[in-house]
Amino acid sequence: MSYNNIICPIEFDESLIKHSASFSVPGKPFGKQRPRVVTRGGFARAYTPKETVEYENKVRSSYKQSVERDYKLSGPISAQIEAIFEVPKSVSKKEKERLLSEEDYTKKPDCDNIAKSILDALNEISYEDDSQVCELYVRKKYGIEAKTNVYLEEIKYY
């Protein structure tokens, strides 16, 4: 894609553009589970749990539906992840208001496992490898509807 304008003959350096992507994954945020190991016939075999595979597929699908281009982010990347957990239906109206305005979600899954499930799912789709993520912010909080908001941006130093 060229950003050079026919009307304005000034050359524009496309390398100065910061590319970004944002999307939401509906449903309860999910932390990446550890690989499982089974032994059969004296051989150990590691596999990824079914729930982790399903969630990573859901992340990929949400990304592809929200981002209308095939461009992969390049260079160092900043990632912001907001994991929103639904307020339990059993709490009172007053407690619900307090949770929504004053309190973060402090139960499992851990922030690092939430980030791992999102970032691993986006390997080779949004960027070549999640090792490109140099800056990471993850927050867990209560909300009306369970979902995970993700914002990725190339880090450019001018």
Give a label for each model feature.
Residues 2-158:
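Acidic, proline/glycine-enriched N-terminal capping motif
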